[in-house]
Amino acid sequence: MKITAIKDLVRKDVPIYYRRLFSGTLVIEMVNSTVESRIDFTVETSPMGQNEIIINSMEQVDYPLLPLNKEVKKFISLLDETGGLPG
């Protein structure tokens, strides 16, 4: 299982400046197929400057949830560090 992209990524307006809410379509490459799943997630900055990624909702995927969530959070963190998330 490998996460290849998040398509149609849109930032939603939130009045709290330290929370950024996003929605998009997660593209997951499995062994024999590619699966797309809708995802909503939040990137919240703590007072110490660390980012916490919270997955609010994700469509059901035929893969164990804990490893999938770990990989999704790692991918989102990488996107955030490289400037891949919309402003």
Whereabouts are the PLM-identified features?
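Short, solvent-exposed beta-strand/turn "edge" segments of beta-rich domains on protein surfaces
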Residues: 11-19, 30-32
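Compositionally biased, intrinsically disordered low-complexity regions enriched in proline and serine
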Residues: 18-19, 23, 64
